[in-house]
């Protein structure tokens, strides 16, 4: 069985929490796109784990984790992430972590380029809100054929790799010295860096596509873990305020290394309210006062898992969520952080947008979204703790009414609801997985 877990909104929906739960019954968890530019947070007891590159299934000892073809991997960051988990007693070996030989390496200069360009753009206020982790530059060089893939580290003693390294270095030094006046990198330094990464990761690098095909043939349960959400997809998001990869479920099998493999289920994860990190149009933040947003941000601890940046927040946006649901083609919906709203006497929901005098019910990321205003309905809050609820019937009537209002606006049932950060603080209804 092949199941994708994806984000319906801007990311930070709680995918890591859902993956961690589903991984209890899974054999393999695969990250299929992105890099270390976002984080998935998993809470186990008193321990909180923030995973930027490693799949959320790494916390389960019987699960094999895969970094797939579609990723760009900062190996220095991966080393630190592995060491941090090992320091907490989490075993990581070539048996439970496999790196695709087709995945792209995020080279040291990609971070440098990202930082320099974002700093340049900030001078006139045109920055994109990059995480400055080199993701766009790693993907750019992938498509320009001016970078390495992980499998190349296994062939550093062969002449064709040396030729490619020289070609890459010459091109990159021209860019960095010509555009940004940086000191050029030497070939010995580049080769030494590659050799160090090969020594650290050669045992982990393999044909993960073949591994996954065999697993599916043996009827293993495979989870595909997306990074970010539909609004950050390079094609279907709010361009240019997107990530540099495809965040949608349809890309999952391709980025995992098993193109053509059919998805059994797609879980779309959304939050009980709206959040966004980074620049770009975000209509939901126009709906309420600054004090309301500050209270919500504190209640939900809405700060970026990868960057620590305060998230932009607003009410649940049904217009954006319908579009994200359509992009992901989800047949299951997980609603997270419902408990964060428990203190509110009244809860706003965005039902449509207003563009001058025109009512907008359909989300169009190619339109001018800066002049949209949110239209809200108010539903009564429940003002009581729900973190102990383990069945839908245990929820207060107004909490059920809030969920059912969202279901009606989305035209889709919600099957999973989290009522706290702990592993056991959730409930299901209808046909879950």
Task: Describe every region a protein language model picked out.
Residues 1-433:
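Non-transmembrane, aqueous-exposed alpha-helical and coiled segments at domain scale
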């Amino acid at each position: 069985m092949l199941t994708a877990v994806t984000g319906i909104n801007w990311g930070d929906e709680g995918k890591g929490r859902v993956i961690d739960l589903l991984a209890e019954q899974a054999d393999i968890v695969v990250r299929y796109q992105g890099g270390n530019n976002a984080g998935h947070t998993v809470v186990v007891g008193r321990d909180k784990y923030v995973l930027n590159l490693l799949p959320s299934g790494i916390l389960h000892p019987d699960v094999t984790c895969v970094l797939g073809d579609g990723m760009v991997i900062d190996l220095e960051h991966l080393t630190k992430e592995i060491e941090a988990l090992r320091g907490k007693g989490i075993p990581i070996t070539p048996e439970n972590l496999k790196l695709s030989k087709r995945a792209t390496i995020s080279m040291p200069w990609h971070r440098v380029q990202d930082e320099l360009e974002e700093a340049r753009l900030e001078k006139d206020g045109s920055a994109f809100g990059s995480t400055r982790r080199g993701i766009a530059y790693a993907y750019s060089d992938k498509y320009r054929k001016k970078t390495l893939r992980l499998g190349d580290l296994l062939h550093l003693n062969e002449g064709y790799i040396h030729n490619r390294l020289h070609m890459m270095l010459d091109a990159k030094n021209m860019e960095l010295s010509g555009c940004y006046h940086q000191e050029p990198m030497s070939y010995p330094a580049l080769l030494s860096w590659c050799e160090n990464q090969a020594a650290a990761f050669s045992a982990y690098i393999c044909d993960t596509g073949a591994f996954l095909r065999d697993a599916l043939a043996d009827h293993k349960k495979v989870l595909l873990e997306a990074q970010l959400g539909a609004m950050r997809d390079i094609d279907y998001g709010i361009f240019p305020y997107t990530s540099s990869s495809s965040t949608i479920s349809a890309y999952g099998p391709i980025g995992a290394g098993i193109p053509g493999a059919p998805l059994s289920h797609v879980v779309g994860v959304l939050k009980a309210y709206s959040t966004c990190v980074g620049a770009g149009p975000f209509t939901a933040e126009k709906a309420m006062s600054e004090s309301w947003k500050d209270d919500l941000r504190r209640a939900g601890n809405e700060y970026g898992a990868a960057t620590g940046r305060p998230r932009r927040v607003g009410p649940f946006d049904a217009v954006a969520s319908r579009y994200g649901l359509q992009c992901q083609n989800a047949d299951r919906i997980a609603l997270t952080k419902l408990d964060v709203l428990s203190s509110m006497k009244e809860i706003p929901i965005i039902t449509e947008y207003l563009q001058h005098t025109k009512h907008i019910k359909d989300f169009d990321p190619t339109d001018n979204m800066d002049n949209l205003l949110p239209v809200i309905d108010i539903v009564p809050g429940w003002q009581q703790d729900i973190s102990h609820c383990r069945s839908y019937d245990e929820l207060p009537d107004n909490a059920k009414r809030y969920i059912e209002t969202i279901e009606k606006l989305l035209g889709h049932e919600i099957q999973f609801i989290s009522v706290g950060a702990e592993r056991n603080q959730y409930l299901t209804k209808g046909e879950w997985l």
